[in-house]
Amino acid sequence: MANVENTWWAEKYRPKTIEEYVGNNEISEYFKHCIEKNELNHLLLYNAKSGTGKTSAAKILANSLDADVMYINASDENSVEIVRDRIKTFASSNSFKTWKIIILDEFSYFTMNAQSALNSMMEQFSKSTRFILTCNEIWRIPEAIKS
């Protein structure tokens, strides 16, 4: 029961705007720039520690831009089928917004096949779709995706 209450509390008080986000000033300033210009590159947010605000930062940025947003928790959904079905369908769909943003939380849980498939999709849909990846274990991410 305590775990459910902690989850509820964390979601209730999760920052929703860049002004509410407290933590890394460098990230906050970069995000403010992205929001002002409505520009975004693919991002990899990582820190060895859990609970440092990676997911909150990703959601704040994505929801502050003119974008359709898809969120996937890769610790639950991490197969190549997720990439080929859900992600490709979303990335290839039409949108009236400037961007489509796909947040892949806990990306290091993606299988190697899923990471390889995603890498080619990041290139294929780079004109309209941006990927924000969060992870704790940067060493599990292939160099091709890090670059």
Residue ranges with predicted function:
Residues 1-147:
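P-loop/Walker A NTP-binding region and its immediately flanking N-terminal helices
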